[in-house]
Amino acid sequence: MNEREALRTFGTGENFHAQHYFGFHETEKNGVKGYIFRVWAPNAEDLHLIGDFTGWFDNPLQMDKNEAGVWEVFTDLPKEGHIYKYLVKRQGGQIVEKMDPFAIYLEERPGTGSLIRTIPEKKWKDGLWLGRRKRWGFFKRPVNIYEVHAGSWKQNEDGSPYSFEQLKDELVPYLVKMNYTHVEFMPLMAHPLGMSWGYQLMGFFAFEHTYGTPEQFQDFVEACHLNNIGVIVDWVPGHFTQNDDALAYFDGTPTFEYQDHDRAHNYRWGALNFDLGKNQVQSFLISSAKFWIDFYHIDGIRVDAVSNMLYLDYDEGPWQPNIEGNNRNLEGYYFLQRLNTVLKLAHPDVMMIAEESTATTKITGRREEGGLGFDYKWNMGWMNDILKFYEEDPIYRKYDFNLVTFSFMYLFSENFILPFSHDEVVHGKKSLMHKMWGDRYNQFAGLRNLYTYQICHPGKKLLFMGSEFGQFLEWKYDHALEWTNLEEEDGLNLKMQDFTSQLNQFYKDHKVLWQLDTSYDGLEIIDADNVDESVLSFIRKNEKGDLLVCVFNMVPVERKGFTIGVPVAGIYEEVWNTELEEFGGVWKEHNMTVKTQKNLWKEYENTLSFTLPALGASIWKIKRRLRK
């Protein structure tokens, strides 16, 4: 794309590689080698380039403005490693220093400048992974995600977070050991506070320097791919930090944000909302998403805070109805549809995931049918119901059994991911282990039951770091995980970690748990009405008709001779039991194999009887089918 076309399409919202035009680029002019700098600031009164190469304010370089509101200057003064900023004179005379919105490198805090650094093109070695990803897709593949905050998974002795060079050496082998299929990172784009959650971004192309360099993250992704692990990143296209040195009121007027003050300001999060209806903003944001896919070979993008982009009244501040008289953010709907259209045309094998907390329909619906076009939506309703149920005293669970079964009413209205995310283990909500009912032993039993239910329930899976070994304390973004839990004398945390690893492998090994995740063809409810005993049972199936019988005892009462109906007569073997001693339970071995009996049980003609462990989950597989 030539420069004229790049400028034109940026203004029409159709430049999806805007970083190739904006920012700084090495070039040659009149036989002189140097750099050209470009920035969009349509309403600035004047604009200069300053940096190490100008003595900062000593000799600022005047930039020229074109008819599209883009300022540019060519200079041979900068050197590799120099820091630069834009000196923006706003209408009215105020002068502010701004970072480059398209910078890939930002200087280390407390500095706020952008860095001139050329990143050599990487010779990737993950072609086999990318080829399989394109060939296999993900809907009929196992997806089990380990959610990570890069700054607090592990830390150095001085309290600094691991770099991605260190994470490559330690996190990648851990993901392999724990049998996860994907890792998802909370925001890695530059944000004002390194030790934070990271959801108020300042650099949408820049890598957060707290975690190392872009090259280190490229190497990390490659290492993941070479070990058959996909990488997903969180991305926040709805709002951005209101820090004055970043995007906020860039040229002195609403530039990236809405013109209307109330729409521009996000009162709940103390941030600014992108004007999603502005063409230049669409070019900027879609270019950002595409850059992370192309440059880092990532396998998925989780779009944060989608609800805030869809509803004018989602925030706590004042709002005005749209032209149709309702609360829908029409620009937000259009932008998300366009985002998914563009990205899926270029990368149909990259997952687009929505973190959306309302009852809005068609989040994963087809765009041509009015849907937003995401591949998956986090099932926040399921998560809230399930955690409320597992926190409850078992005596009362029969009165709230609908919390466990309600999801079967809307299972396939969207393509869901079942998340136990960072949001559920902070702000006094307690860790997942601490949420569980009972003493320490029963809490671990409940956790094993919970994770098995998540694995067996239709939908892809996500678990936040630390939960895999039952960390007791809440997550703190400025503290490393409690790895010392694994050294507890009773060994329950270590056994919990091993349980999670084996459960994840069990999931990968059984197609019935993931091949038909978006259809009732993959699910058959045996009994969702046994509220008095608080036992839930259902069957998962694959395309060949193989099946697993999944039974969950939600109370601490062992049930001998427990009987359910099954659709196939045969010899059944127990292939999973959460109460085995090796997992921290009390059972020394599995149930013995069981032959079905010919009895009428509801609509079934065959029954299966076995001992159901207290507060346990038991999964059965047909070892040999019997003739009718």
UniProtKB/Swiss-Prot annotation:
UniProt entry tagged with the keyword RNA-binding: no
GO MF, any single term: 1,4-alpha-glucan branching enzyme activity
GO CC terms: cytosol
Matches recorded under SUPFAM superfamilies: (Trans)glycosidases (SSF51445), E set domains (SSF81296), Glycosyl hydrolase domain (SSF51011)
Annotated catalysed reactions: Transfers a segment of a (1->4)-alpha-D-glucan chain to a primary hydroxy group in a similar glucan chain
Signal peptide: none
Pfam families the UniProt entry points to: Alpha-amylase, Alpha-amylase_C, CBM_48
UniProt KW Glycosyltransferase keyword: yes
Domain of life: Bacteria
Catalytic activity, EC: 2.4.1.18
EC primary class: transferase
GO terms of biological process kind: glycogen biosynthetic process
Pathway this chain belongs to: Glycan biosynthesis; glycogen biosynthesis
Active site, per annotation: 304, 355
UniProt keyword list: Carbohydrate metabolism, Glycogen biosynthesis, Glycogen metabolism, Glycosyltransferase, Transferase
Family label: Belongs to the glycosyl hydrolase 13 family. GlgB subfamily.
NCBIfam families: branching_enzym, PRK05402.1, PRK12313.1
Its job: Catalyzes the formation of the alpha-1,6-glucosidic linkages in glycogen by scission of a 1,4-alpha-linked oligosaccharide from growing alpha-1,4-glucan chains and the subsequent attachment of the oligosaccharide to the alpha-1,6 position.
Subunit structure: Monomer.
This protein's name: 1,4-alpha-glucan branching enzyme GlgB
Species in which this protein is naturally found: Streptococcus mutans serotype c (strain ATCC 700610 / UA159)
Lineage of source species: Bacteria, Bacillati, Bacillota, Bacilli, Lactobacillales
